[in-house]
Swiss-Prot record:
Disulfide bonds join 75-101. The lineage of its organism: Eukaryota, Metazoa, Chordata, Craniata, Vertebrata. Gene3D superfamilies: 3.40.50.2300, Nucleotide cyclase (3.30.70.1230), Transferase(Phosphotransferase) domain 1 (1.10.510.10). It catalyses: GTP = 3',5'-cyclic GMP + diphosphate. It is an enzyme of class 4 (lyase). Residues 513-786 form the Protein kinase domain. This is Atrial natriuretic peptide receptor 2. The gene is Npr2. Residues 479-1047 are cytoplasmic. The modification Phosphothreonine is found at residues 516, 529. Keywords: Cell membrane, cGMP biosynthesis, Disulfide bond, Glycoprotein, GTP-binding, Lyase, Membrane, Nucleotide-binding, Osteogenesis, Phosphoprotein, Receptor, Signal, Transmembrane, Transmembrane helix. Disruption phenotype: Mice mainly display dwarfism associated with impairment of endochondral ossification, reduced growth of longitudinal vertebra and limb-bone. Self-clasping and priapism that could be due to neuronal disorder are detected. The development of the female reproductive organ is affected. GO terms for cellular component: cilium; cytoplasm; neuron projection; nucleus; plasma membrane; synapse. The modification Phosphoserine is found at residues 513, 518, 522-523, 526. Widely expressed. Expressed in the columnar proliferating and prehypertrophic chondrocyte layers of the tibia.
């Protein structure tokens, strides 16, 4: 055979860097060269090997050594070990690929184990290889195997409660590799290991063979497994039809792992294994008989990477090998070889990085055990025996009209669980047959005696049956009457007058503390706003002393048809811990509303969007578990489905139990938003693609749509980034909904951070939001799935509640501490602002809740000043320029007066009023404090510059007077500390009669300053003061630096 020219390389080694002095990696292949009936034939596998090597890069050259294990077109257990010995002797390979046939693989595996050389194959399905003893310790099976098929069959028996017996029929032609024998061997050993009575027989391909087969079936089991060519199955089923074994008492499992019977052929169409080139009568008989047949095949990987790989495989096979391959399950074996080479490269890389060598084959093989990684064939999971976990599909006649076979269930080998597609199996009698019905096999049982009954026994039996029928009829009539009475009583009805509304604080006070996860001080529960991002709150009220949630219905009236009455009755009948309790409904126009149990902790969406709440994974799993329990109960109830599941429809009660709300009562539902509103699309972020298309769905379809909504909520809980979080994308809800509705590959789904999340949780999300509803699990399966990877979920209800309460207490303690710090900071700011408005001593009295009494002061000194020409300056400036000027000036003044024992009373326009000697008395210091402050302000004005008129000089006019005053706080709103008395008026007159850039002081102030003897004053003379007559006044010129007086 002319092999394609390949340079095989392994890039995974040492992170893409070839070790110094390393030799080429040698890959030896022992596979059939010509016989394409084998899925592991070299023309099928060779292109996959080439693709795998190309995918790995060019860090280390690989020598490819291929030899055929065929002898006259068949697998040879004699030739294969000789080829392997030659390869070892002349080429010393690092890895052996193949053989796929069982007997050659056994021989070669013994040599490989002795050489400590890894042997990788995607064939060799026999159960004998599962025990990796000293003979097969280096054998790695990266493809399907018979023991994994047996595990699937045992799981099927457990599902259908078949625990007694089974019968196996198979064809065993020793001229080839005995594929049927080794395939059904896995089923035999698995069922026998489950303590079932399992009988087997080789099918005789000779006249009388079908009769022998049906005789064997009658004597040994109702659950029959058949493994052989499709023609053999046809012969057995035709005979079974003639003997009435297809009446529903038997089920026939056809083990066709590569699904060849479901592919189109010369005489049959795709999915119709019953079609054959027979008479019309026989064809009809086969079609009827095939209703009792279930076909088991490998599962074709659903991931797009495998589809791309298969396309490339077919192209390479045609170009490099001159072979035309068709898309089929046989190509799965090539994909398994591909993933096996990647696995070997990954483990070899790790071994070298840890200091090992490629020659340490046992160490490399041991490191492959228990591996999980994503390959082109999907999730690859290796068990402890280095056998890959295998997925299977169970096919049934899904459409009785056309006779087409469709998937009824998928089996995940990694999870050991069956996922039902929702398509019912067409059992002839409406239910699975019994595997060990009474008197079918154990004829020695005395209860199986069929002696005719006596006349007396017949009369007694008839009388008993009559009484039973009478009793049942009476019960049904009574039940019907009670139902009509209950419908007529309308126990659910609530009058609008019975609902009480009032102050929300009173409701919250009566309902207990509301310093909880939800907001305080509101009688509302959560609902989505028009923008879909923030929460408003649903109305609450009182009904019979209890706080209830009230949802108004946007309808003018409700017609009480029989259907509506049944809906309301069903809502009252449904009671479960994880569903909000339906209390009643008000149908009094215009106040039509639904009244339900109120959950004070808010909605799940509120909790997830509140960053101050710390949710560890124990708490999150608890919320998820509550949601799954509630949905499982709802799906099994008379209501059957939710239809609008979202995180805002999941609420949390005071005991931190999640409950589902807004279910049922389809007649009350209405859409208030316009068809193109933002809020409408925001609510559809949880809606399944099949619902977005607008097509009506059956009940099972609605349940699968709920599963999709659950997946979006699961993503919300896992990431806490809002519904349908998309990393790096900023799309509106409308754009997201349109992309989901389009259903184009790759399907549009939320972002998942696989590095941060549990792999099994991610897998559950992806299954729940699968595009095909039949691929989604039901909530019963989801419950079991979560129970397995949530190890902490097995604690008791009390322990779980205590853990929730402890976590909430810790979170609340942290929240209170943060709020306390925030309060103290705001208190400090408020006090600072208060001290700027009022004197410190006055502010302290107000803080203590005391009334500030007016107080008389015998002697204080008051300062007044204004700007000469300010009116003209204002007229020539804009209002903003005037404000800027005064702000700059008074900021300067305020900074200066902080250095003196004075109190700033007020500023009015350009007027500035300051006092010393109150509210804290300072003896005789008030006059010199004001004097020094006035001198400082006058000096500051000389260097002050106006921004918009930098060349102009401000002219400050100052007046000072000393005398008695009365002071106190005036007003309740915006209180002010005001001064009263003639001294205030006199000080104002001193300022208004003064001159620019001079300090005008009264004689009383001059007397107070003279006591110090350090201030320079100049007599101005007698000045006529309005309302005062003539007063002798002085100019304050400065202060002499010398020995202090009083100060």
């Amino acid at each position: 055979m002319a092999l394609p020219s390949l340079l095989l390389v392994v890039a995974a080694l040492a992170g893409g860097v070839r070790p110094p002095g390393a030799r080429n990696l040698t890959l030896a292949v022992v596979l059939p060269e010509h016989n394409l009936s084998y899925a592991w034939a070299w023309p099928r596998v060779g292109p996959a090997v080439a693709l795998a090597v190309e995918a790995l890069g060019r860090a280390l050259p690989v020598d490819l050594r291929f030899v055929s294990s065929e002898l006259d077109g068949a697998c040879s257990e004699y030739l294969a070990p000789l080829r392997a010995v030659d390869l070892k002797l002349y080429h010393d390979p690092d890895l052996l690929l193949g053989p796929g046939c069982v007997y050659p693989a056994a021989s070669v595996a013994r040599f490989a184990s002795h050489w400590r050389l890894p042997l990788l194959t995607a064939g060799a399905v026999a159960s004998g290889f599962a025990a990796k003893n000293e003979h097969y310790r280096t054998l790695v099976r990266t493809g399907p195997s018979a023991p994994k098929l047996g595990e699937f069959v045992v799981t099927l028996h457990g599902h259908f409660n078949w625990t007694a017996r089974a019968a196996l029929l198979y064809l065993d032609a020793r001229t080839d590799d005995r594929p049927h024998y080794f395939t059904i061997e896995g089923v035999f050993e698995a069922l026998q290991g489950s303590n079932l009575s399992v009988q087997h027989q080789v099918y005789a391909r000779e006249p009388g063979g079908p009769e022998q087969a049906t005789h064997f079936i009658r004597a040994n089991g109702r659950i029959v497994y058949i493994c052989g060519p499709l023609e053999m199955l046809h012969e057995i089923l035709l005979q079974a039809q003639r003997e009435n074994l297809t009446n529903g008492d038997y089920v026939f499992f056809y083990l066709d792992v590569f699904g060849e019977s479901l592919r189109a052929g010369p005489t049959r169409a795709t999915g119709r294994p019953w079609q054959d080139n027979r008479t019309q009568e026989q064809a009809q008989a086969l079609r009827e008989a095939f209703q009792t047949v279930l076909v088991i095949t490998y599962r074709e990987p659903p991931n797009p990477e495998y589809q791309e790989f298969q396309n490339r495989l077919l192209i390479r096979a045609r170009e490099d090998f001159g072979v035309e391959l068709a898309p089929s399950l046989m190509n799965l074996i090539a994909g398994c070889f591909y993933d096996g080479i990647l696995l070997y490269a990954q483990v070899l890389n790790e071994t070298i990085q840890e200091g090992g060598t490629r020659e340490d084959g046992l160490r490399i093989v041991e490191k492959m055990q228990g591996r999980r990684y994503h390959g082109v064939t999907g999730l690859v999971v290796m068990d402890k025996n280095n056998d890959r976990e295998t997925d299977f599909v169970l096919w049934a006649m899904g459409d009785l009209d056309s006779g087409d076979f469709q998937p009824a269930a998928h089996y995940s080998g990694a999870e050991k669980q069956i996922w039902w597609t929702g398509r019912p199996i067409p059992w002839v009698k409406g239910a699975p047959p019994l595997d060990n019905p009474p008197c079918a096999f154990d004829l020695d049982d005395p209860s199986c005696d069929k002696t005719p009954l006596s006349t007396l026994a017949i009369v007694a039996l008839g009388t008993g049956v009559t009484f039973i029928m009478f009793g049942v009829s009476s019960f049904l009539i009574f039940r019907k009457l009670m139902l009509e009475k209950e419908l007529a009583s309308m126990l659910w009805r609530i009058r609008w007058e019975e609902l009480q509304f009032g102050n929300s604080d009173r409701y919250h006070k009566g309902a207990g503390s509301r310093l909880t996860l939800s907001l305080r001080g509101s009688s509302y529960g959560s609902l989505m706003t028009a923008h879909g991002k923030y929460q408003i709150f649903a109305n609450t009220g009182h009904f019979k002393g209890n706080v209830v949630a009230i949802k108004h219905v946007n309808k003018k009236r409700i017609e009480l048809t029989r259907q509506v009455l049944f809906e309301l009755k069903h809502m009252r009948d449904v009671q479960f811990n994880h569903l909000t309790r339906f209390i009643g409904a008000c149908i009094d126009p215009p106040n039509i509303c639904i009244v339900t149990e109120y959950c004070p902790r808010g909605s799940l969406q509120d909790i997830l969007e509140n960053d101050s709440i710390n949710l560890d994974w124990m708490f999150r799993y608890s919320l998820i578990n509550d949601l799954v329990k509630g949905m499982a109960f709802l799906h099994n109830s008379i209501i059957s489905s939710h239809g609008s599941l979202k995180s805002s429809n999941c609420v949390v009660d005071s005991r931190f139990v999640l409950k589902i709300t807004d279910y049922g009562l389809a007649s009350f539902r209405s859409t208030a938003e316009p068809d193109d509103s933002h809020a409408l699309y925001a609510k559809k972020l949880w809606t399944a693609p099949e619902l977005l298309s607008g097509n009506p769905l059956p009940t099972t379809g609605m349940q699968k749509a709920d599963v999709y909504s659950f997946a979006i909520i699961l993503q919300e809980i896992a990431l806490r980034s809002g519904p349908f979080y998309l990393e790096g994308l900023d799309l509106s809800p409308k754009e997201i909904v349109q992309k989901v509705r389009n259903g184009q590959r790759p399907y549009f789904r939320p972002s998942i951070d696989r590095t941060q999340l549990n792999e099994e949780l991610v897998l559950l999300m992806e299954r729940c939001w699968a595009q095909d509803p039949t691929e989604r699990p039901d909530f019963g399966q989801i419950k079991g799935f979560i129970r397995r990877f949530n190890k902490e979920g097995g604690t008791s209800i009390l322990d779980n509640l205590l853990l929730r309460m402890e976590q909430y207490a810790n979170n609340l303690e942290k929240l209170v501490e943060e709020r306390t710090q925030a309060y103290l900071e705001e208190k400090r700011k408020a006090e600072a602002l208060l001290y700027q408005i009022l004197p410190h001593s006055v502010a302290e009295q107000l803080k203590r809740g005391e009334t500030v009494q007016a107080e008389a002061f015998d002697s204080v000194t008051i300062y007044f000043s204004d700007i000469v020409g300010f009116t003209a300056l204002s007229a020539e400036s804009t209002p903003m320029q005037v404000v800027t000027l005064l702000n700059d000036l008074y900021t300067c003044f305020d900074a200066i007066i902080d250095n003196f024992d004075v109190y700033k009373v007020e500023t009015i326009g350009d007027a500035y009023m300051v006092v010393s000697g109150l509210p804290g008395r300072n003896g005789q210091r008030h006059a010199p404090e004001i004097a020094r402050m006035a001198l400082a302000l006058l000096d500051a004005v000389s260097s002050f510059r106006i921004r918009h008129r930098p060349h102009d000089q401000l002219r400050l006019r100052i007046g000072v007077h000393t005398g008695p005053v009365c002071a106190g706080v005036v007003g309740l709103k915006m209180p002010r500390y005001c001064l009263f008395g003639d001294t205030v008026n006199t000080a104002s007159r001193m300022e208004s009669n003064g001159q620019a850039l001079k300090i005008h002081v009264s004689s009383t102030t001059k007397d107070a300053l003279d006591e110090l003897g350090c201030f320079q004053l100049e007599l101005r003379g007698d000045v006529e003061m309005k309302g005062k007559g003539k007063m002798r006044t002085y100019w304050l010129l400065g202060e002499q630096k010398g020995p202090p007086g009083l100060l």
